[in-house]
Amino acid sequence: MDEWMNYEQFDRQTWHGFFPTDSVRLTQGNLDEIKSLNDRISIEDVQDVYLPLIKLIQLRYQNFLEWQMQKANFLQRSTMRIPYIIGIAGSVAVGKSTIARLISILLNKMLPDKRVELMTTDGFLYPNAELKRRGIMDRKGFPESYDMERLLKFLNDVKAGEPVVKAPTYSHQVYDVQLDKPLVIDSPDILIVEGINTLQLPSNQQLYVSDYFDWSLYVDADPDLIEHWYLQRFGMLLDTAFTDPSNYYYPYSKGDRQEAFKMAKYVWQRVDLPNLREFILPTKSRADVILHKTTGHVVDKLYLRRG
């Protein structure tokens, strides 16, 4: 079966033509501040890819608000403030975090009267101590390593209009959850939820994370390219960790670099690549938009779900 049968495909030039404007002013310096270590994003990317994407999200959001008003009228009740939730999924090292931050900034500029907040599902990983207790430390990132019940409760509270909801955070520096440093989500109009597991359908659940999404994006790239970006990022992490003994990567930065990369490649092949193939890639067809990247993190194609 053709994996693209329910999508319309657009090349970059065609996509740009749907909203050919540069009305949102950003500098390359602004973009460098939000991009992840080895990611790449340019002013041309914003104009060609992301501004049309933001316009599409804006249209969907307007429809969402209209539906909330119509539903409230039908039920003969006052309109509640219900957050619009955007899910962003894709492999590790594919650039989800950069895209999520960029979308957040652009939405804030395009919708200045709306409160836009951003979070990652990494904080809902079980702490390392719990992963070790369960004997699944080597499965970190796989579906069973997440506290899905807690994540679902968080999303349910947000959708229910709870004014203040707290989410645990994750530190890539110490490679563990930070339960004592929660992220406070305070009455957002739009919430962006980024993570590898946002579109997954765990077999032991009747309720899924994506049930709470109003719109979703999958960031796609060839697995060989993602591996290259993964190892490139690992090298940059080594370069930034060698002066900080508290950093998870510090021991690797002080040891044999070739051995460190050998370890990273092993982790990719034994953990991240199987996770991508078995649990992340199969969720691609559940996204409203698929953003495809090629060499250098350049977006060359976009796929828009029909209907």
UniProtKB/Swiss-Prot annotation:
**What CDD domains does this protein's entry cite?**
PanK
- GO cellular component terms attached to this protein's record: cytoplasm
**What InterPro entries does UniProt report for this protein, alphabetically?**
P-loop_NTPase, PanK, PRK/URK
SUPFAM superfamilies annotated for this entry? Answer: P-loop containing nucleoside triphosphate hydrolases (SSF52540)
EC number per UniProt: 2.7.1.33
Q: Which HAMAP family match?
A: Pantothen_kinase_1 (MF_00215)
Q: What is this protein called?
A: Pantothenate kinase
Q: What is the gene called?
A: coaA
